[in-house]
């Protein structure tokens, strides 16, 4: 079946738009020299690698799922067990069996296990899960040395649509076809789109793809003056980093605003909007100030009053249309819309000279660079105005700086000193908040200090200085007397013959104590190193910021892309070292570097000039050699001085200059990364930076000594600005790494800080900076430790007398108990509040931090609801103008998640079924605590539409009495919703009785709204009510299914039909066709239909009438009273009558006598109206009394009491005559220690429920016992069998002797004519389902595959004792009925013939497929013979076998 389903799934996948795909790769095993090949959905093997073969192409479609490009299905396994087969499945992001991860040394396996993707063991052709981690479990991307995660998943963020910019889900289903890429299907305009859930047909959520397609220019607004394109994504809800990723997917970037005209244009463009939009401005770098993503200069300021806030973590900026398009800084993890920008950034084109057009010729004391001359005036300090005049007198101007290379030249070669503070030409004197160069050149580059430009305290800080150890910029009051830098155009364009710098050979450049040479050939890292060695030099090292600046100015403007440095981790992966024996004192990594990359380090040119990338050492690039200049006196070795001490309880080693201390805090005292950094700074230190294994071992010793195993600690590691990789917050080099495997992964684009796990591996992980952790501080040896800061007041908010926490104008209650949403809200309202409404990031952050520190791990309900049309509303009716959804949320899972919770670990929100018990947050205004509680609004009475049944304030209708009404669970729910209702939620025993009462005439089970689709074993009502009442049938949930796993049974039915468990619940597969029950609220506009009672007081139900007698009598007097009123004391023969009786007595809340009694029938409980006891509903520990009368208690269960007690009682009238049992015919059943035969009429029956068999095996088991599989010839026999198997329903269903022959005729195995049938509705069905089972729960028949494993029923005639008298005459026909047939007879041979051919006719291929499903029952080496004969304890004798096989040959023509 699985094969057919998957092939059907594949057949509907159309050709969709194929992206030019670096995402695709081949999975390669180096030892086998073979690639994974998906031959079919159930066969994943290997083959000779062929990059053109679609069947060998795979790609990641989520962070942990790999999809076959050919089949659009995902790699998965049926179970997390050794030797499970890896095959292809419909992609399911929630399935644990489809989640893969890369492990150390190219191992690849199921996530969270030590089971690896393996090929070649045990000569198995298919890929398997295997515990071994040898070479056959190691996989790479074909053609590379990289593991499979190097081609990891990149989320594609959708545009417009109705999914709030959610990530495209691949593959997704549209009109029952599957798409693995963006498509234009269904659109006349050709626009490419994607579903944002896997099933668009169900969820209807979509967005357009961030790709170029015909008409995609309409997604952009073009400024007619500049030609720049802008895209306003106001409907999206993404974090800052996600928004930037979305822009970059369109070859754009987040908005940068460099001109006043641009801001005015955007103000008009966004004027109709009100909520904030992300722009590219940020202060993510720990070393520099405000900057635009993408590198545009930050020269125009448009801050909202009060912004930028200095609050830690508010590092990203939004443009707020509702506040005149002003800017404000927020936490980067907030989810907002955003603006993308594409095109030139300036109206004034300006060409920065390249290294090839650099003229020379400058006056004395001036330094040449790229066509200009520069000079620092340090001693003669002037205010900015006079410094400008002085530069102009010399023929120049205050320096303008237009690139990182020019900046680094000034910083490194002009004699800049760390304590300098020098005027440059940037200022906003002419136009406030709009910086310009005094020489009139365009502003193309800025390099601000942290927190700059500030216009601090609203002072007129209109001029700019270059200051500090890094030479970054700050705005200052122009009247301060400072030094200054002048710049002028080169005086001469004549090329001066190049001479040798002092102490260097010709062609080498001098800087400080060293000479440098740019290599002339493209070389690998090794060849470049050899070349430098031959020049008596070495590949360059970089000791500090100044040397880096010199090298940037040396190579940054050159046309080559990379230049090798001497840094690599080839000796020890993860630890970067220079080729010479020098300590790594400085690093300058590019974005995403070094990450998990291993290799050699090269310096980049161009826009990212000077930044370092890790490349394959075999790549070819130019290089820079370095050696000591001649005549330089090398600095002496440092003299040994006594090592400074560390503060008490701090750890260190002689190999580091730092002291370290752990701050392992309780839950209430953990901090965010920013708070931890500020704490460490306050005591004179910094968050720890780990630069070697020695320092890591120091921290490990601290962990072991304090017992802080497995705790998580903040490090100073942070992913800074978009142009940088991970950096240490103290500015030290990132030369040593110890990332956990697969990290850093920036999961969901919100992980920008580093933590260390306190286990022996000491591995690092990137995580959301707002997470609460312990932390590790470091301090320089010998430095004085400052006092620890006192906690801020807001860390310990005041609390009211009744336990509510006060924050601003509101009070909050944080529950410790879990409740459904309805109960939680009732509690809040009882205490003059409601579930919390969250209106701002600060409020969200306060609540999140409080529950993180003080609450449990479970989420908390807040006061948001999601309507059926997926709109958001606050319960108090206030406007939704702030949201904080977690990534991928709301996902409307199962279309029944209408409530919202806040995650404890992140503060983000998730949609959830309202009936799922959670903690909750109540909110009330400070002024509400003295208020009077609002009166409860009475329920408005109303009626139901025709055909619906009224019970209290609900209307019910049962569908399924007509076969065409039956539906799958999802279709049934949609049908109910179409009737303005939902599938029924049964909230108490009274409602259950009402439903059972109305299902009396059903022959079907009926869907309810209960399901565990979203979370296995967590059953919830789809309408969102709490699950406070259940009525599971015996063995449910999780009763056995024929050829179905328990996990497949996710939806719940009320059992109907003539089962003794009618009215109880059973979980079943959601796609099976069943009846269903809809529920709606009453309609106040409809009248309530009055109920009438007949004059005689008897109400008809079914074929009987009942009357509740409201007077208390002893049992015997009650019986007499009923007889005097032409009725009898009521017998209750099935669950329906029980529900009816309980509903009649429930309003009076008193017990009632019923007709069950044991004191009149020799202590056997029987119905006094002579009906057979086939149904009981005993209460716990009943029946207690041996001789007693029985009453129905107020809870509907039956209990025993002495008959002289006085109760109400139920009388019953009925024209039905109790069925009499057929007389037992003479004879007896076989006696055996192994088998227990049960007599009925003229036959004996054996019920086998403990050992299941296929139909063929069951047939021969019966034959071995001298019987045959049961034939059912009368309704009485059917009732007898149903009664006997019903108690066994939780064990198995039972084979009977009916089969379908090749002509399609149904026959009994013993050749009896088919004169009676009892098919389940919808059966018989299926071309290959040729054998019949009797369902234990209902007694009905259904046909299934003959190789399924079931219990079975054998039948044989009673054995007649021999008699010596001649008075009894027996006919031949009677003799045939009563005499058991000998095993070697032709009848037995005929049976065996049928059995053999039925099994063959059932299909060998399908048999072996089912053998796999039932591996626990079927021997591994099953053959045709031993499957049929040799599973039993006894095998046929030789003579029997000979006779049987001979008869098979003789009778073969009769069957085929």
Swiss-Prot record:
Ranges annotated as spanning the membrane: 1389-1409
GO CC terms: cell surface; endosome membrane; plasma membrane
Residue intervals on the Cytoplasmic side: 1410-1456
Subcellular location: Endosome membrane; Cell membrane
C-type lectin domain span: 225-341, 369-487, 511-626, 655-778, 807-923, 951-1079, 1101-1212, 1240-1355
Covalent S-S links between cysteines: 35-49, 74-91, 102-149, 168-194, 182-209, 247-340, 316-332, 391-486, 463-478, 532-625, 600-617, 680-777, 753-769, 828-922, 899-914, 976-1078, 1051-1070, 1122-1211, 1189-1203, 1262-1354, 1331-1346
Residues linked to a glycan: 104, 344, 529, 926, 930, 1159, 1204
Topology feature Extracellular, residues: 20-1388
Gene Ontology MF term list: cargo receptor activity; D-mannose binding; transmembrane signaling receptor activity
Induction: Down-regulated by interferon gamma.
Keyword check for Repeat: yes
Function: Mediates the endocytosis of glycoproteins by macrophages. Binds both sulfated and non-sulfated polysaccharide chains. Acts as phagocytic receptor for bacteria, fungi and other pathogens.
Protein name: Macrophage mannose receptor 1
Native organism: Mus musculus
């Amino acid at each position: 079946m699985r094969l057919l389903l998957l092939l059907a799934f594949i057949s509907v996948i159309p050709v969709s738009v194929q992206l030019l795909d670096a995402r695709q790769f081949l999975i390669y095993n180096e030892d086998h020299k073979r690639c994974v090949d998906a031959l079919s959905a159930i066969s994943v093997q290997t083959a000779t690698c062929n990059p053109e073969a679609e069947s060998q192409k795979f790609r990641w479609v989520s962070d942990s799922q790999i999809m076959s490009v050919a089949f659009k299905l995902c790699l998965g396994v049926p179970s997390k067990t050794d030797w499970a087969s890896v095959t292809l499945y419909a992609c399911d992001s929630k399935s644990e069996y489809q989640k893969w991860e890369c492990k150390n040394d190219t191992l690849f396996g199921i996530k969270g296990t030590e089971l690896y993707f393996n090929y070649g063991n045990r000569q198995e052709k298919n890929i398997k899960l295997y515990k071994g981690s040898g070479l056959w479990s190691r996989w790479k991307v074909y053609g590379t040395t990289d593991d499979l995660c190097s081609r990891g998943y990149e989320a594609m963020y959708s545009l417009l649509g109705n999914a709030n910019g959610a990530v495209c889900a691949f593959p997704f289903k549209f009109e029952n076809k599957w798409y693995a890429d963006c498509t234009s299907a269904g659109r006349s305009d050709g626009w490419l789109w994607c579903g944002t859930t896997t099933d668009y047909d169900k969820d209807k959520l979509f967005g357009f793809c961030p790709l170029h397609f015909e008409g995609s220019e309409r997604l952009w607004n073009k400024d007619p003056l500049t030609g720049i394109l802008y895209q306003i994504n106001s409907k999206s809800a993404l974090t800052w980093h996600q928004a930037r990723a979305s822009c970059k997917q369109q070859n754009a970037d987040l908005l940068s605003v460099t001109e006043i005209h641009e801001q005015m244009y955007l103000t008009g463009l966004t004027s109709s909007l009100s909520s904030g939009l992300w722009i590219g401005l940020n202060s993510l770098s720990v070393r520099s100030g405000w900057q635009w993503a993408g590198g545009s200069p930050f020269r125009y300021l448009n801050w909202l009053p009060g912004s930028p806030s200095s609050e830690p973590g508010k590092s990203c900026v939004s443009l707020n249309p509702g506040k005149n398009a002003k800017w404000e800084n927020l936490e980067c993890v907030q989810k907002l819309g955003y603006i993308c920008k594409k095109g030139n950034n300036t109206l004034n084109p300006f060409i920065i000279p390249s290294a090839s057009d650099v003229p020379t010729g400058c006056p004395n004391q001036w330094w040449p660079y790229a066509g200009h001359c520069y000079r620092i005036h340090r001693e003669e300090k002037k205010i900015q105005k006079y410094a400008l005049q002085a530069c102009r007198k010399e023929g120049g101007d205050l320096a303008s700086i237009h690139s990182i290379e020019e900046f680094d030249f000034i910083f490194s070669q002009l004699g800049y000193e760390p304590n300098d503070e020098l005027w440059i030409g940037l200022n906003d004197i002419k136009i406030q908040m709009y910086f310009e160069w005094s020489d009139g050149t365009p502003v193309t580059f800025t390099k601000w200090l942290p927190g700059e430009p500030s216009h601090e305290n609203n002072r007129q800080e209109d001029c700019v200085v270059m200051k500090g150890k890094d030479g970054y910029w700050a705005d200052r009051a122009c009247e301060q007397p400072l030094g200054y830098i002048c710049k002028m155009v080169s005086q001469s364009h004549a090329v001066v013959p190049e001479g040798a710098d002092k102490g260097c050979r010709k062609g080498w450049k001098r800087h400080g104590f060293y000479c440098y040479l740019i290599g002339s050939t493209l070389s690998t890292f090794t060849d470049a190193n050899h070349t430098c060695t031959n020049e008596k030099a070495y590949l360059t090292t970089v000791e500090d910021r100044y040397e880096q600046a010199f090298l940037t100015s040396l190579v940054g403007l050159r046309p080559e892309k990379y230049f090798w440095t001497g840094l690599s981790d080839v000796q020890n992966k993860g630890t970067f070292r220079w080729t010479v024996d020098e300590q790594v004192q400085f690093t300058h990594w590019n974005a995403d570097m070094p990450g998990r990359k291993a290799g050699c380090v090269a310096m980049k040119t161009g826009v990212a000039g000077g930044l370092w990338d890790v490349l394959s050492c075999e790549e070819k690039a130019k290089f820079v050699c370095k050696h000591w200049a001649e005549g330089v006196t090398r600095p002496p070795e440092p003299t040994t001085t006594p090592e400074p001490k560390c503060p008490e309880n701090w750890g260190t080693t002689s190999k580091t200059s730092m002291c370290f201390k752990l701050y392992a805090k309780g839950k209430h005292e953990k901090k965010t990364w920013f708070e931890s950094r500020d704490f460490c700074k306050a005591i004179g230190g910094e968050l720890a930076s780990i630069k070697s294994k020695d320092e890591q071992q120091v921290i490990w010793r601290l962990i072991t000594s304090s017992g802080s195993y497995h705790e998580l600690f903040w490090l100073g590691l942070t992913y800074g600005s978009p142009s940088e990789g991970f950096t240490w917050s103290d500015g030290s080099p990132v030369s040593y790494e110890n990332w956990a495997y697969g990290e850093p992964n920036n999961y969901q684009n919100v992980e920008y800080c580093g933590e260390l796990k306190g286990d022996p591996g000491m591995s690092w992980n990137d995580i959301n900076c707002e997470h609460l952790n312990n932390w590790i501080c470091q301090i320089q040896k010998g430095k004085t430790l400052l006092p620890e800061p006192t906690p801020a007041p807001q860390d310990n908010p005041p609390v009211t007398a009744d336990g509510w926490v006060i924050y601003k104008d509101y009070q909050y209650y944080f529950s410790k108990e879990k409740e459904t949403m309805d109960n939680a809200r009732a509690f809040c309202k009882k205490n003059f509040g409601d579930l919390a409404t969250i209106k701002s990031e600060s409020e969200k952050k306060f609540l999140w931090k409080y529950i993180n520190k003080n609450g449990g791990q479970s989420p908390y309900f807040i006061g948001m609801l999601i309507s059926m049309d997926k709109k958001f509303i606050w319960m108090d009716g206030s406007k939704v103008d702030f949201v904080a959804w977690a990534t991928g949320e709301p996902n409307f899972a199962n279309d029944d998640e209408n409530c919202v919770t806040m995650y404890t670990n992140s503060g983000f929100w998730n949609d959830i079924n309202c009936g799922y018990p959670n903690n909750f947050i109540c909110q009330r205004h400070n002024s509400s605590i003295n208020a009077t509680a609002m009166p409860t609004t009475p329920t408005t009475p109303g009626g139901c539409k025709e055909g619906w049944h009224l019970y209290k304030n609900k209307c019910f209708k049962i569908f399924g009495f007509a076969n065409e009404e039956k539906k799958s669970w999802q279709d049934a729910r949609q049908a109910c919703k179409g009737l303005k209702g939902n599938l029924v939620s049964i909230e108490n025993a009274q409602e259950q009785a009402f439903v059972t009462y109305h299902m009396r005439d059903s022959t079907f089970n009926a869907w309810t709204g209960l399901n565990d689709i979203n979370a296995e074993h967590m059953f919830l009502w789809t309408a969102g009510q709490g699950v406070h009442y259940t009525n599971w049938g015996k063995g449910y949930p999780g009763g056995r299914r024929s050829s179905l796993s328990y996990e497949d049974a996710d939806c719940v039915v009320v059992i109907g039909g003539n089962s003794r468990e009618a009215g109880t619940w059973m979980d079943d597969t959601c796609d099976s066709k069943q009846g269903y029950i809809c529920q709606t609220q009453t309609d106040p506009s409809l009248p309530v239909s009055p109920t009438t009672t007949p004059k005689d007081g008897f109400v008809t139900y079914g074929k009987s009438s009942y009357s509740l007698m409201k007077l208390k009598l002893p049992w015997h007097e009650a019986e007499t009273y009923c007889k005097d009123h032409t009725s009898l004391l009521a017998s209750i023969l099935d669950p329906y009558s029980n529900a009816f009786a309980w509903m009649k007595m429930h309003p009076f809340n008193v017990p009632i006598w019923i007709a069950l009694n044991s004191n009149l029938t020799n202590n056997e409980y029987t119905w006094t109206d002579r009906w057979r006891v086939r149904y009981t509903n005993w209460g716990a520990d009943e029946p207690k009394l041996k001789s007693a009368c029985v009453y129905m208690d107020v809870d509907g269960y039956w209990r025993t009491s002495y008959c002289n007690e006085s109760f109400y009682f139920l009388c019953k009238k009925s024209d039905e005559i109790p069925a009499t049992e057929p007389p037992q015919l003479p004879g007896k059943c076989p006696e055996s220690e192994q088998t227990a035969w049960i007599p009925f009429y003229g036959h004996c029956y054996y019920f086998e429920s403990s050992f299941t068999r296929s139909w063929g095996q069951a047939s021969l088991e019966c034959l071995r016992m001298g019987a045959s599989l049961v034939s059912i010839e009368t309704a009485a026999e059917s009732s007898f069998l149903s009664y006997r198997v019903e108690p066994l329903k939780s064990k198995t269903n039972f084979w009977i002797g009916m089969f379908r022959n090749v002509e399609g005729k149904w026959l009994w195995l013993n050749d009896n004519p088919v004169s009676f049938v009892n098919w389940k509705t919808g059966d018989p069905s299926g071309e290959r389902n040729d054998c019949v089972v009797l369902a234990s729960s209902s007694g009905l028949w259904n046909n299934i595959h003959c190789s399924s494993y079931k219990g079975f029923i054998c039948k044989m005639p009673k054995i007649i004792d021999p008699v010596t008298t001649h008075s009894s005459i027996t006919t031949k026909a009677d003799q045939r009925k009563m005499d058991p047939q000998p095993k070697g007879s032709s009848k037995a041979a005929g049976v065996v013939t049928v059995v053999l051919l039925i099994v063959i006719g059932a299909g060998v291929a399908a048999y072996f497929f089912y053998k796999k499903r039932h591996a626990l029952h079927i021997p591994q080496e099953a053959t045709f013979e031993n499957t049929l004969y040799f599973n039993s304890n006894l095998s046929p004798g030789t003579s029997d076998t000979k006779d049987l096989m001979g008869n098979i040959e003789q009778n073969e023509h009769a069957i085929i």
